[in-house]
Amino acid sequence: MPETKVEKKEPVSLASLMTPSKTVTIDFPGFAEMTVDLCYLAREELVRLRKKCLSTKWNKKTRQPEEELNEDKFLVEYCKGVIKGWKGLKYRYLEELLLVDVGDFDPEDCLPYTQDNAELLMKNASDFDTWVTETVGDLENFTGNK
């Protein structure tokens, strides 16, 4: 009986399958036609982002160095890494998210996405901040398995 050769496949490396980030467009709950482009960051990316915002200070009482997170810098870096854009953020929606005076604008017009606008919204609108953080933290939002 002739011998059949069985080809041995090289094992697949998980590292070759992993992707550090993925951006998807997600509907913002409660606001018709408003979508936010969010980027999922792998744990390694989040750790790298956090490390950028750490500084070491000397504690005179304990005589030990202590790491301190610069929260403002972290918010800037987090927004840059996670919020990639939005569409349909009407001025009337802003009134439900934070205290604003939009009387000079058509309530149906939209606030354009800018890095500064994203940071201010994250800093001052706790509902938006909470939603972004929870949505980005849920891997299913980025895998299509929901």
List each model region and its residues.
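Generic detection of short hydrophobic beta-strand segments and adjacent strand-loop junctions
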Residues: 22-26
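Short, surface-exposed, charged amphipathic helix/loop patches that serve as local interaction elements
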Residues: 2-3, 28, 32-146
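Short, intrinsically disordered N-terminal pre-domain segments
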Residues: 1-20
